[in-house]
Amino acid sequence: NSDEQFDDYGYMRF
């Protein structure tokens, strides 16, 4: 994903 979002664990997903 190109959007910066935090998953349920708190890691940034790009």
Curated annotation (Swiss-Prot):
<keyword id="KW-0527">Neuropeptide</keyword>
<dbReference type="GO" id="GO:0005576">
    <property type="term" value="C:extracellular region"/>
</dbReference>
<protein>
    <recommendedName>
        <fullName>Sulfakinin-2</fullName>
    </recommendedName>
</protein>
<keyword id="KW-0964">Secreted</keyword>
<feature type="modified residue" description="Phenylalanine amide">
    <location>
        <position position="14"/>
    </location>
</feature>
<comment type="function">
    <text>Myotropic peptide.</text>
</comment>
<dbReference type="GO" id="GO:0007218">
    <property type="term" value="P:neuropeptide signaling pathway"/>
</dbReference>
<keyword id="KW-0558">Oxidation</keyword>
<feature type="modified residue" description="Methionine sulfoxide">
    <location>
        <position position="12"/>
    </location>
</feature>
<keyword id="KW-0027">Amidation</keyword>
<comment type="similarity">
    <text>Belongs to the gastrin/cholecystokinin family.</text>
</comment>
